[in-house]
């Protein structure tokens, strides 16, 4: 509740996000959501005159969407992930984009939209490949095979 009451520096925003990450690692997903939701709202409202990439929005939105997906709030996760995807593209900030695409692929899979899921898995796979993220390449290959029987090469 108190997250939106002040003005924060970039480091303080990262610190609040890291607090949410502690809850994530402890598998306390609802506690993480309780931090990430007001933090994202704060970033969207208080820092609206700062470019979203500078305001840490893609990073916070990625974590928030991932947590929403974990607690099976797929519609909400898609809404947040699509918002983050758009910011990444509009502002040329691609650090979180491959992970955001993977979240979208997973959510659409769980909603039964195989076609959209396959398209997004391919997009995420190639971005992971471009940036040589071997760990996430292995994860996405396994996941696409398990969920969709999809071979990514």
Question: What does each model-identified segment do?
Answer:
Residues 7-8, 52-53, 92-93, 113, ...:
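Short coil/turn linker motifs that delimit alpha-helical repeat modules in TPR/alpha-solenoid proteins
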Residues 14, 52-59, 99, 119, ...:
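Residue register of alpha-helical TPR repeats
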Residues 1-4, 37-48, 82-89, 123-133:
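Amphipathic alpha-helical segments of tetratricopeptide repeats
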């Amino acid at each position: 509740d108190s997250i939106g009451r002040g003005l924060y520096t970039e480091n303080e925003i990262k610190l609040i996000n890291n607090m949410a990450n502690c809850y994530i690692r402890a598998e306390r997903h609802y506690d993480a959501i309780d931090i990430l939701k007001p933090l994202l709202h704060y970033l969207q409202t208080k820092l609206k005159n700062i470019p979203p990439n500078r305001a840490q929005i893609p990073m916070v939105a990625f974590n928030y969407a991932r947590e929403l997906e974990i607690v099976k709030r797929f519609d909400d996760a898609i809404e947040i992930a699509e918002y983050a995807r758009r910011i990444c593209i509009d502002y040329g900030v691609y650090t979180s984009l491959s992970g955001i695409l993977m979240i979208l692929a997973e959510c659409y899979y769980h909603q039964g939209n195989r076609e959209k899921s396959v398209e997004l898995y391919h997009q995420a796979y190639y971005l992971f490949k471009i940036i040589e993220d071997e760990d996430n390449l292995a994860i996405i290959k396994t996941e696409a095979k398990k969920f969709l029987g999809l071979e990514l090469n």
